C-alpha cells in the first residue's frame, strides 16, 4: 500500500514505516502529525485517484528530528569592478516517520 501526499507544496510517495524529509514544520520532535491532502491511494489492486484529494484518507506520522540540508554557496561577481559577494544557505528539513495510512 502506498500513497501520494502533498506536504507544503511538494509531493511525496509514501509507504508505512518510511522516513521522509519534508520542508521544516513547526511541530516539536516526538510529536505526532497527520496529513490529509492525499492525491492518490493504492491498496493491493484498488487505486483511488483524488479529485483533487481522496475524501476520508489520512496519513499519520511522527516527527523524528529537525535537520539542515547541505550548504549551498551563492557567489556573485562583476568583472573588472572588484565586486564580489559570497553567501551561504542551509535549508531546514523535518524528518518524519510515516506510521499509518488510513482510508
Swiss-Prot record:
List, alphabetically, the InterPro entries matched. bL21-like, bL21-like_sf, Ribosomal_bL21, Ribosomal_bL21_CS
The record's section on SUPFAM superfamilies has:
L21p-like
Which residue stretches, if any, does this entry annotate as coiled coil?
A: none
Task: Tell me the Gene Ontology biological-process terms attached to this UniProt entry.
Answer: translation
Q: Name one GO cellular component term.
A: ribonucleoprotein complex
Q: Does the keyword Transmembrane helix apply?
A: no
UniProt keyword annotations, A-Z: Ribonucleoprotein, Ribosomal protein, RNA-binding, rRNA-binding
Q: Which GO terms describe its molecular function?
A: rRNA binding; structural constituent of ribosome
| Subunit and partners | Part of the 50S ribosomal subunit. Contacts protein L20.
Family, as annotated: Belongs to the bacterial ribosomal protein bL21 family.
**What is the protein's known function?**
This protein binds to 23S rRNA in the presence of protein L20.
**Protein name, as recorded:** Large ribosomal subunit protein bL21
Taxonomic source organism: Amoebophilus asiaticus (strain 5a2)
Tell me the organism's taxonomic lineage. Answer: Bacteria, Pseudomonadati, Bacteroidota, Cytophagia, Cytophagales
The gene designation is rplU
Amino acid at each position: 500500500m502506498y500513497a501520494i501526499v502533498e506536504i507544503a507544496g511538494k509531493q511525496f510517495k509514501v509507504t508505512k514505516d518510511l522516513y521522509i524529509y519534508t520542508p521544516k514544520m513547526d511541530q516539536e520532535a516526538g510529536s505526532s502529525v497527520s496529513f490529509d491532502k492525499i492525491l492518490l491511494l493504492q491498496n493491493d489492486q484498488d487505486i483511488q485517484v483524488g479529485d483533487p484529494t481522496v475524501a476520508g484518507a489520512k496519513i499519520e506520522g511522527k516527527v523524528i528530528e529537525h535537520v539542515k540540508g547541505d550548504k549551498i554557496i551563492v557567489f556573485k561577481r562583476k568583472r573588472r569592478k572588484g565586486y564580489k559577494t559570497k553567501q551561504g544557505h542551509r535549508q531546514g528539513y523535518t524528518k518524519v516517520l510515516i506510521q499509518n495510512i488510513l482510508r
